Design a protein with these regions (language model features):
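Short, small/polar residue-rich loop motifs at catalytic or cofactor-binding pockets
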Residues: 50-51, 93-94, 208-209, 232-234
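Hydrophobic, proline/glycine-rich low-complexity stretches
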Residues: 39-70
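Hydrophobic h-region of N-terminal signal peptides that target proteins for export
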Residues: 15-23
Length: 263
């Protein structure tokens, strides 16, 4: 069993509860909603930022893309937003926005590309399916593709590394538990069903806690917690800072000579 400190784990749970924790007591929620109904109508709750920042995406040591992201809680749901901008002269811009409920249920996912081509994707749940609608500049009517997947399936879209951070938090909360003053994670990798909207495909991925590593981040040596993310045809290494809310700090994709580093 892999261990992480219980003290640091508490912070991860606080962050994660906004994303996939079980709903609170229904009677208490009903009473609270009744008492505060008029106040809520008059003034929506202010958004609380869980994490925000940017990742630099490097290929063969050269920065090629910057991802700017935020994770916010507001009005009972969490919203994960991200923007990709290319550093090359040929502009490439993409945005994504994902809203999920406290029980992990997907409300809506949107992806848009404004340059060099105009296209968009929307994913929403419908009964036992996730429905993806794809719009391109070449088509006047959106194409629709259903996926037989639970509405709690995670979105892992191409190049949006903040989605990987949310998946890590889900893994830490679901597959680790306190024991003997420490948090222990299951030894075998945990499997998750995910949807990759840009590729119009679903897949199974595996996450596994490896342990502590000493690595260089921006020229300084850091001791970070390493996890492996793998699936059919890929194997990534991810490092999170267990002393700072389990934030994703670095990703290594050796097969593509790619590295992702938090700015």
């Amino acid at each position: 069993m892999k261990r992480i400190s219980e003290r640091r784990w508490g912070t991860a749970i606080v962050l994660f509860c906004a994303l996939v924790a079980h709903a609170g007591d229904k009677n208490q929620d009903r009473d609270r909603n009744k008492d505060n109904k008029e106040k809520a109508k008059a003034k929506p709750a202010a958004a609380q930022t869980v994490d925000s920042g940017s990742f630099g995406i490097f290929v063969k040591g050269q920065r090629v893309v910057t991802e700017t992201f935020s994770i916010q809680q507001q009005n009972g749901s969490s919203v994960i937003k991200s923007e990709l901008k290319s550093t090359s002269t040929a502009a490439h811009e993409q945005t994504s926005a994902m809203e999920i409920m406290p029980n992990g249920q997907l409300v809506r996912y949107e992806w848009d590309e404004t340059s060099p081509a105009v296209s968009s994707v929307v994913v929403t749940p419908s009964n036992e399916f996730l429905i993806e609608k794809i719009t391109t500049s070449a088509s006047s009517k959106p194409a629709e593709q259903p996926f037989l997947m639970p509405n709690t399936s995670m979105i892992l879209d191409n190049n949006f590394f903040v989605h990987r951070e949310v998946l890590l938090w889900r893994y830490l909360a679901a597959d680790c538990h306190p024991e003997g003053g420490h948090m222990q994670c299951q030894k075998e990798p945990a499997e998750f069903g995910v949807l990759v909207p840009q590729d119009r495909t679903s897949m199974r991925v595996r996450l596994e806690l490896v342990g502590k590593d000493k690595i260089n981040v921006h020229g300084a040596q850091r001791e970070l917690m390493r996890l492996n993310l793998s699936g059919d045809g890929f194997n990534w290494q991810l490092w999170v800072d267990d002393s700072d809310q389990f934030k994703l700090m670095r990703v290594a994709i050796p097969a593509d000579n790619t590295e992702v580093v938090r700015d």
